[in-house]
Amino acid sequence: MNLVKILFCVFACLVFTVTAVPEPRWKFFKKIEKVGQNIRDGIIKAGPAVAVVGQAASITGK
């Protein structure tokens, strides 16, 4: 009977600690996602400029 009470208390403490863990302050994957979005936005913004440079190079024959 005592073993059952001890195991129940240990299990209850384990469940409490797992559910009471706060969120981490530094969200690693959010930072990676933001870097990826910035790279994607930079590529989208640079697309027209690269196309113009390509057309200019083809006009001059280089």
Curated annotation (Swiss-Prot):
Keywords from the UniProt entry: Amidation, Antibiotic, Antimicrobial, Immunity, Innate immunity, Secreted, Signal
Domain of life of the source: Eukaryota
Signal peptide, first to last residue: 1-20
InterPro entries per record: Cecropin
Gene Ontology BP term (one): defense response to Gram-positive bacterium
A GO cellular-component term linked to this record: extracellular region
Modification Threonine amide, positions: T60
Record localization: Secreted
Positions of the pro-segment in this chain: 21-24
Keyword Secreted attached: yes
Disulfide bonds: none
Main function: Has antibacterial activity.
Entry's family note: Belongs to the cecropin family.
Identification of the protein by name: Cecropin-A
